[in-house]
Amino acid sequence: MTFTVLIPARLASTRLPNKPLADIGGAPMVVRVAQRVLSGAGLAGRVRVVVAGDSPLIIEACQVHGIEAVLTRTDHPSGSDRLAEACDLLRLGDDEIVVNVQGDEPLIDPSLVAAVAGLLLNQPAASMSTAAHAINSEAEFNNRNVVKVVLDAQGLALYFSRAPIPCWRDQPLSANDSAALPSPPPLRHIGLYAYRVGFLRRFPTLAQAPIEITESLEQLRALWHGYRIAVHIAPHAPGPGVDTPEDLERVRHLFGA
């Protein structure tokens, strides 16, 4: 299996300006993300990693460290639009698979990236794939910032929601009691996606779905329009991303340890 990892990177960030270029152990964060993916066991020769940046500064930083990069427009309304442009710039075929890895995840697990790509390759009915892991507390289950997903018998997503789904009508939960969560446990969505390139090119042209707007979840647009999303069940939660200066300091400490 061969696939392409696209890492969208834009300089504008309200909480952490110039985030892709933030130094982590002597290299920009977006470079650390690319290096992390390339370090995955068994991925050598199977994965092409490309940063899709919106500034020449990002492109130059990647090139200095030997990371492939393409310059995309600054006016894209969403990350999906940026990825679609990158696919065109790279002349990728419609049947190829790309994985969207966020540029602020220097601790991403390369095996998770490979698993999501492999799942899509083996699920011909799906247009895209993603991942999830078990929720182990009621507080997490009820948190609106935690996106939940429910699957069908084939491991395809039925729905994503910020609400606690599924709802166990006859089994009330006790506050912060992991033992009260029914089995099998509910699933927390991990924001990692693989796409068939042809679908990724169509996606930005699809009308926004009412449920997408209500939940503020872009992946619901695919379900609304009848496309299927395969879901890989990961054994544990992914490493933390970088959204704030405090997150950045924690990651710097981990790289320096």
From Swiss-Prot:
Q: In which pathway does it act?
A: Nucleotide-sugar biosynthesis; CMP-3-deoxy-D-manno-octulosonate biosynthesis; CMP-3-deoxy-D-manno-octulosonate from 3-deoxy-D-manno-octulosonate and CTP: step 1/1; Bacterial outer membrane biogenesis; lipopolysaccharide biosynthesis
The UniProt entry's coiled-coil ranges are: none
- What enzyme category does the UniProt record give? transferase
- The source's domain of life comes to Bacteria
Catalyzed chemical reaction(s): 3-deoxy-alpha-D-manno-oct-2-ulosonate + CTP = CMP-3-deoxy-beta-D-manno-octulosonate + diphosphate
Ribosomal protein found in the keyword field: no
- InterPro entries given in the database record: Cytidylyl_trans, KdsB, Nucleotide-diphossugar_trans
What GO CC annotations are associated with the protein? Answer: cytosol
Intracellular or extracellular location(s): Cytoplasm
Which GO terms of type biological process are on file? CMP-keto-3-deoxy-D-manno-octulosonic acid biosynthetic process; lipopolysaccharide biosynthetic process
For the keyword Nucleotidyltransferase, the answer is yes
State the UniProt keywords alphabetically.
Answer: Cytoplasm, Lipopolysaccharide biosynthesis, Nucleotidyltransferase, Transferase
MF-aspect GO terms = 3-deoxy-manno-octulosonate cytidylyltransferase activity
E.C. no = 2.7.7.38
Q: Show the Pfam families listed in the entry.
A: CTP_transf_3
Q: What PANTHER family does its record include?
A: 3-DEOXY-MANNO-OCTULOSONATE CYTIDYLYLTRANSFERASE (PTHR42866), 3-DEOXY-MANNO-OCTULOSONATE CYTIDYLYLTRANSFERASE, MITOCHONDRIAL (PTHR42866:SF2)
Q: Which NCBIfam families match?
A: kdsB (TIGR00466), PRK05450.1-5 (NF003952), PRK13368.1 (NF009905)
Family in the record: Belongs to the KdsB family.
Per its database record, what is this protein's job? Answer: Activates KDO (a required 8-carbon sugar) for incorporation into bacterial lipopolysaccharide in Gram-negative bacteria.
Which HAMAP family does this one have? KdsB
Task: Give the protein's recorded name.
Answer: 3-deoxy-manno-octulosonate cytidylyltransferase
- To which species is this protein native? Albidiferax ferrireducens (strain ATCC BAA-621 / DSM 15236 / T118)
